[in-house]
């Protein structure tokens, strides 16, 4: 049975790691970690959220003897602190592949919830209903996260991430925010009021926008894993894909600037107060032209700063187009830039309804506005319930209704998602992890796994180390591990 262990990358290997062949290019590894909220309605007596989560994970515990496991598609499934089930996608080379893996996580969580619901109904009422929320704030005001992971070349200093990337991450929420109804009005993000630091290595005693804890899950001399905490959980497929795609292009420009010792174009974008800027961006609809103060003393609107990033990336593409194109197997640079340009133009015009088929906050705003027109006496509590239904991946109806009526863009089909549930990406080390986990489960072997280690613990101990996340070809030690199965 599998056991989970944490991987401390710097002590992984007895010999010096072989530098990745991708170190000199623009290829990247993408990943998304999503914490889900759980609740039960319709029960005859209260059901603790922690009990619900444990009931959901009972099949996992029965199979793996743990609430932490890796799946045959290369992903990690585990029960996080408290009652939040979490799914971390397998390593992907393309935002589209990462999107498919993220949607596979929704599928897995939904199935776990519906199985647990049948069990709960035996004890708590035939009407007991489990809700699994892909959002970031619960009704008690507790925040939980959606974290993006990007493999970044280590020669880029953390100070540069804070000063050149963070302003982009804050203002990209104009089109990636999930939106939230609050007693004080509608915000375009979910977590702005909960993030209090720009960068930090802690995530418990503080709530940073970017986590700097050094766990690259790769050669630590070549790469760091950028752990982005600012960002909402998205139902919109377009938003999940878009936030990964545009962030990749900005990171490419930053990396190339440090590689060559040239300006990136983002040197003067740092905010004087990132947390204050984040809160202002979240209230974009209150004042779309609100000015944000930069460290230089200059003031600029969120949209104005996004246009600066867009212009700098466009100029970068003109001289690096071929190299950038080869960095993404399934997404074209033309598509990313076209979508970016169109969304900025729509925001400039105030044409928020034009974004309602792809941007979560715009979709929710359209729904709330229509509801208030039909029912002027609608209460905040009723709108809050509608919002929760939008985020409920287990028993919610609203988002599914939007997609079935083509009011929300879908980039992947149901077959694409079903494939991602059972299969890892074929061009990263996730392919090897998935192959090992699938084989070990099929024969009932005792094994352990993490992002960089695969270990057979009985009847004989064998181990394979997968330090290069880009490498999908079996190593001799991996082949020996598989033969031992």
UniProtKB/Swiss-Prot annotation:
The answer, when asked if Ribonucleoprotein is one of the entry's keywords, is no
Question: What metabolic or biological pathway is this protein involved in?
Answer: Protein degradation; proteasomal Pup-dependent pathway; Protein modification; protein pupylation
Entry keyword annotation includes Magnesium: yes
Residues holding Mg(2+) = 33, 78, 86
**For this chain's UniProt record, which GO biological process terms are given?**
modification-dependent protein catabolic process; proteasomal protein catabolic process; protein pupylation
What the entry lists under InterPro entries is as follows: Pup_ligase (IPR022279), Pup_ligase/deamidase (IPR004347)
The positions making up the signal sequence are none
Query: GO MF terms on file?
Result: ATP binding; ligase activity, forming carbon-nitrogen bonds; magnesium ion binding; ubiquitin-like protein transferase activity
Catalytic reactions of this protein: ATP + [prokaryotic ubiquitin-like protein]-L-glutamate + [protein]-L-lysine = ADP + phosphate + N(6)-([prokaryotic ubiquitin-like protein]-gamma-L-glutamyl)-[protein]-L-lysine
- What more is known? The reaction mechanism probably proceeds via the activation of Pup by phosphorylation of its C-terminal glutamate, which is then subject to nucleophilic attack by the substrate lysine, resulting in an isopeptide bond and the release of phosphate as a good leaving group.
Q: Which PANTHER family match?
A: PUP DEAMIDASE/DEPUPYLASE (PTHR42307), PUP--PROTEIN LIGASE (PTHR42307:SF3)
Identify its protein family.
Belongs to the Pup ligase/Pup deamidase family. Pup-conjugating enzyme subfamily.
Annotated protein name in UniProt: Pup--protein ligase
Q: What is the lineage of its organism?
A: Bacteria, Bacillati, Actinomycetota, Actinomycetes, Bifidobacteriales
């Amino acid at each position: 049975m599998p056991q989970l262990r944490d991987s401390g990358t710097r002590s992984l290997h007895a010999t010096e790691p072989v530098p990745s062949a991708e170190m000199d290019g623009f290829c990247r590894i993408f990943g998304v970690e999503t914490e889900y909220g759980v609740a039960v309605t319709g029960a005859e007596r209260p059901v603790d959220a922690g009990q619900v989560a444990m009931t959901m994970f009972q099949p996992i515990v029965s199979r793996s003897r743990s609430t932490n496991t890796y799946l045959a598609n290369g992903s990690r499934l585990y029960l996080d602190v408290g009652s939040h089930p979490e799914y971390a996608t397998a390593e992907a080379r393309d935002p589209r592949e990462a999107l498919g893996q993220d949607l596979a996580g929704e599928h897995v969580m939904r199935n776990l919830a519906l199985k647990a619901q049948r069990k709960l109904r035996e004890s708590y009422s035939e009407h007991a209903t489990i809700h699994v929320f892909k959002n970031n704030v619960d009704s008690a005001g507790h925040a939980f996260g959606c974290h993006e992971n990007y493999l970044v070349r280590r020669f880029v200093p953390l100070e540069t991430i804070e000063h050149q990337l963070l302003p982009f991450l804050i203002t990209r929420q104009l089109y990636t925010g999930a939106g939230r109804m609050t007693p004080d009005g509608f915000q375009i993000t979910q977590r702005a009021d909960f993030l209090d630091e720009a960068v930090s290595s802690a995530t418990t005693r503080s709530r940073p926008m970017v986590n700097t804890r050094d766990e690259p899950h790769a050669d630590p001399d070549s790469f760091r894993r950028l752990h982005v905490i600012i960002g909402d959980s998205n139902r919109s497929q377009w938003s999940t894909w878009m936030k990964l795609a545009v962030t990749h292009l900005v990171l490419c420009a930053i990396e190339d600037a440090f590689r060559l010792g040239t300006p990136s174009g983002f040197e003067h974008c740092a905010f004087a107060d990132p947390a204050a800027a984040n809160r202002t961006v979240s209230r974009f609809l209150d004042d779309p032209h609100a000015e944000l103060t930069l460290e230089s003393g200059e003031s600029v609107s969120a949209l104005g700063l996004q246009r600066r990033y867009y212009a700098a990336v466009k100029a970068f593409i003109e001289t690096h187009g071929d190299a950038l194109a080869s960095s993404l197997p399934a997404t074209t640079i033309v598509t990313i830039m076209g979508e970016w340009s169109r969304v900025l133009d729509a925001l400039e015009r105030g044409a928020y309804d034009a974004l309602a088929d792809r941007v979560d906050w715009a979709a929710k705003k359209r729904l709330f506005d229509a509801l208030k027109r039909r029912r002027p006496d609608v209460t905040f509590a009723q709108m809050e319930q509608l919002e929760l239904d939008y985020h409920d991946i287990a028993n919610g109806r609203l988002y599914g209704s939007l997609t079935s009526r083509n009011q929300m863009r879908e980039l992947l089909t149901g077959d694409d998602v079903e494939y991602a549930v059972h299969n890892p990406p074929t061009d990263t080390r996730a392919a090897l992890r998935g192959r090992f986990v699938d084989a070990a489960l099929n024969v009932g072997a005792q094994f352990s796994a993490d992002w960089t280690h695969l270990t057979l613990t009985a009847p004989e101990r064998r181990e394979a180390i997968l330090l290069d996340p880009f490498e999908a070809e079996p190593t001799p030690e991996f082949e020996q591990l598989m033969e031992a199965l």
